Amino acid sequence: MHMPVAGPHTHTLFTVSRTMLTVVAALTPATLFGLWEFGWPAIFLFLTTVVSAWVFEVACLKIADKPIRPFATDGSAILSGWLVAMTLPPYAPWWVGVIGSFIAIVIAKHLFGGLGQNLFNPAMVARAMLVVALPVQMTTWIAPVGLLEGPSFLHGLSITFLGSQEFDAVSSASTLSHIKSQISAGATMGEILPTLADLESRLLGFVPGSLGETSTVLLALGGLLLLVTRIITPTIPLAVLGTLVTLSAICSFLAPDRFAPPILHLTSGSTMLCAFFIATDYVTSPVTTAGKWVYGIGIGTLVFVIPLRRLPRGRGLCGALDELGHAPDRNLHPAADLRTVPHRQAACAAKPAKGAQK
């Protein structure tokens, strides 16, 4: 009797928990910057969102009768809650964060079987559903004034947990929202660009936006950490950013009065968060190199095209599910792998092991 021979095992220092911890570390600089710039309301919202995500994780594990300790401490729930919090307006009410965590953990993750079984990135599902269900709360932007100059501790509690509206006096439009409104009013890009924040402010993050998405530099540095530690490969980020730059450069050259230059796309919204942290999600992205290129180009194209349709925060998270616009691209990744897997590899995978049928 012939017994099938087990395949070789790949060993790595990066367990699930270590991988999640590394991603959290990469997100930390941009997150801390956002918390400092937007102050106490952002801090309270962030903590509420992350803690509620972990609580929902434990509850789902308990209901499913799964071991709580290994899954609740692997960092996946914390990371999902962290990403949800980073995509929220900094002065959003506490219940927006809790609902976002519920959607991410209960609906987008455990409803499909838990870690590794989700069809879409849980945080992006939460973001998409929140934008559709709560457009006002999800499109209210605040100009960053710093922790010391912003609302006090007690005032921050009032804003986050009691719904105080006193902050309306300092509310502002995000870069993308401002451009859309001005174009709708008939202004040209040449007239709009001088009214935007300068390049330095957009790079560093001194602009209105979501809690952890404003600093292009810090998010890019976090992405570089993921590349250096080999948590991700450069293929998908290069495909996303390269496609976005190429399309915006062509359109800006052909119609400069209507289309923004590439640098504005790279420093607006959450392009870097998308390219390095969302599009590279292990579960929802391809594994073959060619598949990653196809997948990244698809996301980069959608990131450029969706704002042209006047959808709210169309670039938003630049991920596969942002405002539901990127959902089809996430669903295509198995097809991208199937079409791009080497023929020899596919043939070997289809051939039964010697003696397996005996």
UniProtKB/Swiss-Prot annotation:
Q: Write out the GO biological process terms.
A: electron transport chain; nitrogen fixation; transmembrane transport
Q: Which InterPro entries match?
A: NqrB/RnfD (IPR004338), RnfD_bac (IPR011303)
**Looking at the UniProt record for this protein, which Gene Ontology cellular component terms does it annotate, in alphabetical order?**
plasma membrane; plasma membrane-derived chromatophore membrane
Give the subcellular location.
Answer: Cellular chromatophore membrane
Source domain of life is Bacteria
Recite the UniProt keywords alphabetically: Electron transport, Flavoprotein, FMN, Membrane, Nitrogen fixation, Phosphoprotein, Translocase, Transmembrane, Transmembrane helix, Transport
Q: Summarize induction of expression.
A: Expression is reduced under iron-limiting conditions.
Enumerate the Pfam families for this protein. NQR2_RnfD_RnfE
Q: What does this protein do?
A: Part of a membrane-bound complex that couples electron transfer with translocation of ions across the membrane. Required for nitrogen fixation. Involved in electron transfer to nitrogenase.
In which family does this protein belong, per the annotation? Belongs to the NqrB/RnfD family.
Protein name per the record = Ion-translocating oxidoreductase complex subunit D
